[in-house]
Amino acid sequence: MKSLLLLSILAALAVAALCYESHESLESYEINPFINRRNANSFISPQQRWRAKAQERIRELNKPQYELNREACDDFKLCERYAMVYGYNAAYDRYFRQRRGAK
């Protein structure tokens, strides 16, 4: 019985020591963590923004066919549900291939 009491006291002390909440994590040393709208994108140069837009356009133009099929299927709810069971290729074939005349 004494060992059980001693064990429970040690467990309570361990829980109290491990669950101590420090208020330091709640404090912020910054006066204002937000920046205004003018300075929000000032850390990215205009050339980097242009390069990112150009790369995005290239990625959009060079998408593989299965990705284009998947995007078309995602916009149509029935096709998306069918794809969850049978896969995107089967769903695209069922809902879109017949409309375009391909077999």
Swiss-Prot record:
Main localization of the protein described in the UniProt heading: secreted
UniProt keyword list: Chondrogenesis, Developmental protein, Differentiation, Disulfide bond, Gamma-carboxyglutamic acid, Osteogenesis, Phosphoprotein, Secreted, Signal
Residues recorded with modification Phosphoserine: S22, S25, S28
Domain of life: Eukaryota
Leader sequence residues: 1-19
Span of domain Gla: 51-97
Propeptide stretch(es), residue numbers: 99-102, 103
One GO term (biological process): regulation of bone mineralization
Modified residues (4-carboxyglutamate): E21, E56, E60, E67, E71
Localization in the cell: Secreted
SUPFAM superfamilies the record matches: GLA-domain
PTM per Swiss-Prot/TrEMBL: Requires vitamin K-dependent gamma-carboxylation for its function.
GO molecular function: calcium ion binding
A GO CC term attached to the entry: extracellular region
Cystine pairs: C73-C79
Function: Associates with the organic matrix of bone and cartilage. Thought to act as an inhibitor of bone formation.
Protein family per UniProt: Belongs to the osteocalcin/matrix Gla protein family.
This protein's name: Matrix Gla protein
